[in-house]
């Protein structure tokens, strides 16, 4: 009797684990598969003014929609697992100190980095600050990503100019944002009607 109980318990744990969308390159497919995600991203847009396609492009780059994503560990002497290079965690890859700032100013005490709704709200919050402090348009995915990656101080001092690789990543994020915008234009009415139906 013990073995079936253990297997049942393990299955229940697996079922509770957030699985990334099967087709993360198609925002319509992603929102159809993850039924609550469209409304979560829309809530963030209505709260912070950062377009859904921009939020999702940044999240795609940061975690590929993996709930518990973390930077890979470094290796000591080539074979001993060592520390991770940063405390970044979750869908938005928010670092500990930045997440704490978010909780203090905008989030709720129960917000989690591995919760999609909280993560997309965090991205909206951070990009809204980038807009207010740095004058970056909320539709400018490339520069919003540079500010997201480098921090507001780093972006202000143009630290990204010394990182050609990062500039290429920002261009990639901008292209994905444009792709997501076009894709969303073909399915958003459907998503809106479905969300109204299940409200």
Q: What is the predicted role of each segment?
A:
Residues 4-13:
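Sec-dependent N-terminal signal peptides
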Residues 19-191, 195-198:
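Catalytic glycan-binding domains that act on GlcNAc-containing polysaccharides
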